[in-house]
Every structure is written in C-alpha cells, then in structure tokens.
C-alpha cells in the first residue's frame, strides 16, 4: 500500500487533476492500457493505484511492457534540484538565491552535517520550497503542483511525527527512531528561526510525504558501466503504484540513454490476473515491519515469503538484567561495547524465529559468554566466532535470558501499553506482543534459532535499524 490516503472529494479532484496535468503537459508518458484510480486494496490507507486494462495492452507478447515513462527532468531528487538551482535566467533567480541562502545557513552549523543524506536534504529543499511558495516566491509548475496537490495533501501518522507533536511517555521508547527525531526536531527549530510565523504543519507534512514516497532509483556510475548507485527520488505518477512483495507484477527501471524513469510491467507475473488488475511494485527488497511502520505508516500484509521484525530490547529491562559472567547490567555492557540491542526475528509461514544468521547476532551474544582476557569488541567477536564451544555456551545463556524476557513482556504487555503512548507506537507494541507470544511458543516446543529450521539456505539480508533515543549517541548518520 502507498500510505497517505486522500480523504474527501476535494483531495480526490486535486490528485486526479495532478495526474492529468503531468500527462497533458507531456511530463509523463502513459501507455494506453494504464489508468489511475482508487486502489482496490481493502484498507482505509490504500490511496490511489495504477491499473492495467489487458484489452488495451499492445505488447502482450513481450516479457516486459513500458507502462509509464517519467522524463529525467521531472524526477525530483537532490541531483535534479541542484541542476535546476545551477541554471539562471528562467525567471526564478530570486527563489533560487533564497533556497541557496537557507541551505548554506543550515549547513553552516557543522553539527548538522550528520544529517546530510539524500533523503534528508530532499526534505530540506522541499520544505524551503513549500514555505517560500506560500510567501509568494515563484517556482516551476512541476514543483508547485506536486508540492501542493501531492506532498502537502498526504495524511500520514508515524512514530516520529506523533512523538514530536503529542505527549509521549516511556512506553515504546525503545522502538523510536532516534536519528530521525533529532533531524526533524533540528529542522523544525531551524525553520522556526528562519521564518517568522511559519507553521510546523507544513514541515511535518513535507517530511512525512517525502519519506514515504521516495523510491531508490538506480543510476549508472559512468556511461556504459555495470556499476550503479541509487538515488532517493520522488517520481510523479509512478509513485501512485502500491507496494506488495508477494503480488509484485511490475518494477521500475532507468533508460540509460535519457535517464528517464520507467514503470515496467512483468508480463509473466500477470498470468491469471484477469482482464483488469492493479499494478504492484516492491518499495524495498525485504519487508522489515518496524521500518515500514516508521516510513510508510502501516504494516505490510502477511507474506508467503520471509518478513522481519527488529525486536528492540527495552533499556529499562536491560538495566535490571545482570550479565551471567559480570557485575554489570546488560544495558551497561551493550552501551560500553556500542552494541545496539535488538533481536532480528524472521517471520516465515506463520512461525517466528530468532535469525541467528543476522550479521549483528554475535554482538548480541557478547554479554552471555566470558571472554575477559580480551577487552575490545572486535577481539571478543573474533574469539567468539572462532570457538564453537564458546558460541554454544553464549547461545544457551542467551536463550535463558530470552525466555525470561518474553515471559515478562507477555505478562506486562497490557500494563506497558496503558501509559501515555502515541497510536503508532501502541500499534508497534501490540504487534510485538503478538510476535512475542508466537516466539515463546516456538522456544517452548523446540529451537528458536532459524538455523535449526533453515540449515541449507540463509534468509535475505535485512539492513540494521536506527538506534532508539537511549542509544542515540551511536548515531552518526540516518
């Protein structure tokens, strides 16, 4: 699903007008078989979707059919915005100069350099553009229309937004995104200081909409090269396409000669879908449910493939747990070793397992084995990985801790959720409670480690999560 539904008739007209404008002005090329309508996903957050009418499909014998073509100049990314800012004499010089001035002011504070990622800078660019546009400064229609009718109309609730706008207690604090909270609060402070009377709502909406609508578009590193980098980009019209790893029947690609972004239909994946069907792409190659909630405001539907859940361990409870071979608490040891305490759970066919294939899993085991002769983390990890007896001991001690942790979590779940907690974090905690019950059942009836059930193949790689506020000192980039 694409989060951020457009509620009410005025928003509906606005979105359709936006699509018509981009298509009518040649900003996007659309195949005759394509239409943009309300998604058929049964959810209030499903928004719009891209549909294909098979009767109008002109190249059904091909392996892939081009559904949409968005010219490079109409893709909104840091790269294309910098290209636009570098030009002169198009009637927008005053607006460009102000954008550059405010960008320089933000980056003048060297502590803000840690926020420099493509996505964060895209948020800053577009927040400045939205505010200046409201104050009468001119910008090209392709930017103004997308800002006004898409980004600023997106309604989205995520933990970061709710924490910064509502009362948030300690419940669920270990599932908060520390780096993004720091970035957004810093951005709000900068904007309020730079623009008198600016409302937080504009910045918050731009932040949430950009984060949820960005796609990672590949770009070759040099002409003809097989190597490529990805760029966080907003792709008008193509970004109406909804997400599903399980039902994916299309993908986005780049025309190497023109740089245009393409939505391609995978014809083989459409067999049996009927005469008219909705198009789905994958926003990311793996589904980590906490990340999805933070980014898109929803949990993806259960999949027949592997999904992941990064179970963050409560810093409050870690302070109460003593390490088996030391006097310090688990929280103290993890902090000293700069280990982010989370367990990567693999969700497969309704079962929940501890993913001991995860690259960070050995770090999680360090407090559960006695390696006093070595002081630094890397030496301890090398010793642990190279000694099967040590590894087995660490896993056994870890499982004992995990059993106690799950018992406490299941027993105290309702109490933990009764305090002041925003709706998004409550959703995460309730899902955590459900998965904890299933994991505890797995632990009680056999091995909880994924390697015991998937000995021949390992699951796909899942990127590490961002640290929660108690571990924000570990943050170097978002």
Curated annotation (Swiss-Prot):
The UniProt entry, under PROSITE patterns, shows:
SAM_MT59, SET
A Gene Ontology biological process annotation? methylation
Cellular compartments annotated: Cytoplasm, Cytosol
Query: Is Hydrolase among this UniProt entry's keywords?
Result: no
| UniProt GO MF annotations | [cytochrome c]-lysine N-methyltransferase activity
- Catalytic reaction equation(s): L-lysyl-[cytochrome c] + S-adenosyl-L-methionine = N(6)-methyl-L-lysyl-[cytochrome c] + S-adenosyl-L-homocysteine + H(+)
Where does the UniProt entry say this protein principally localizes? cytoplasm
Keywords associated with the record: Cytoplasm, Methyltransferase, S-adenosyl-L-methionine, Transferase
Coiled-coil spans in chain:
none
Cystine residue pairs: none
Q: Name one GO cellular component term.
A: cytosol
Is Phosphoprotein one of the keywords? no
Under which main EC class is this enzyme filed? transferase
Q: Where is the SET domain?
A: 32-284
What does the entry's free-text domain comment contain?
A: The SET-like region, although related with the SET domain is not detected by any prediction method.
* Protein role: Methyltransferase which mediates trimethylation of cytochrome c (CYC1).
What family is it from? Answer: Belongs to the class V-like SAM-binding methyltransferase superfamily.
* Name of the protein described by the UniProt record: Cytochrome c lysine N-methyltransferase 1
């Amino acid at each position: 699903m694409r989060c951020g539904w457009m509620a009410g008739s005025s928003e509906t007209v606005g979105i359709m007008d936006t699509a018509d404008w981009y298509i009518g002005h040649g900003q996007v090329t659309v195949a005759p078989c394509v239409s943009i309508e309300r998604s058929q996903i049964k959810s209030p957050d499903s928004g719009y979707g891209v549909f294909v009418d098979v009767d109008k499909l002109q190249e059904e014998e091909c392996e892939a059919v081009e559904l949409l073509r968005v010219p490079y100049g109409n893709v909104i990314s840091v790269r294309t915005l910098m290209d636009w800012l570098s030009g002169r004499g198009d009637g927008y010089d005053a607006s460009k100069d102000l954008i550059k001035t405010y960008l320089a002011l933000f980056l003048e504070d060297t502590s803000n350099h840690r926020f420099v990622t493509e996505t964060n800078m895209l948020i800053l660019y577009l927040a400045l553009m939205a505010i200046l546009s409201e104050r009468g400064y001119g910008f090209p229609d392709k930017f103004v229309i997308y800002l006004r009718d898409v980004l600023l109309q997106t309604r989205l609730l995520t933990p970061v937004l709710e924490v910064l706008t509502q009362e948030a207690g300690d419940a669920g604090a270990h599932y908060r995104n520390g780096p993004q909270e720091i970035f957004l609060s810093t951005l709000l402070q900068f904007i309020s200081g730079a623009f008198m009377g600016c409302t937080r709502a504009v910045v918050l909406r731009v932040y949430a909409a950009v984060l949820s609508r960005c796609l990672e578009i590949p770009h070759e590193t040099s002409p003809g090269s097989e190597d490529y980098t990805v760029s966080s980009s907003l792709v008008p019209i193509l970004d109406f396409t909804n997400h599903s790893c399980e039902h994916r029947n299309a993908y986005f690609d780049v025309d190497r000669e023109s740089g245009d972004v393409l939505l391609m239909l995978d014809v083989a994946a459409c067999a049996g879908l009927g005469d008219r069907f909705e198009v789905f792409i994958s926003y990311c190659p793996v589904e980590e449910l906490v990340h999805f909630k933070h980014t898109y405001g929803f949990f993806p539907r259960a999949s027949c493939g592997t999904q992941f859940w990064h179970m963050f361990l409560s810093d409050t409870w870690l302070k109460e747990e003593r390490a088996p071979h030391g006097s310090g608490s688990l929280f103290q040891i993890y902090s000293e070793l700069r280990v982010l305490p989370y367990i990567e759970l693999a969700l497969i066919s309704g079962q929940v397992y501890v993913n001991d294939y995860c690259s960070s899993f050995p770090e999680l085991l360090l407090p559960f084995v006695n390696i006093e002769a070595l002081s630094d983390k890397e030496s301890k990890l090398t010793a642990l990985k190279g000694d099967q007896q040590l590894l087995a001991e660490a896993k056994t001690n870890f499982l004992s801790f995990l059993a106690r942790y799950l018992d406490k979590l299941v027993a105290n779940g309702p109490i933990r959720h009764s305090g002041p907690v925003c709706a998004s974090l409550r959703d995460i905690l309730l899902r955590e409670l459900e998965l904890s019950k299933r994991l505890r059942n797995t632990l009680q009836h056999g091995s909880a480690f994924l390697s015991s059930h998937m000995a021949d193949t390992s699951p796909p790689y899942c990127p590490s999560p961002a640290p929660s506020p108690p571990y924000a000192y570990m943050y170097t980039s978002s």
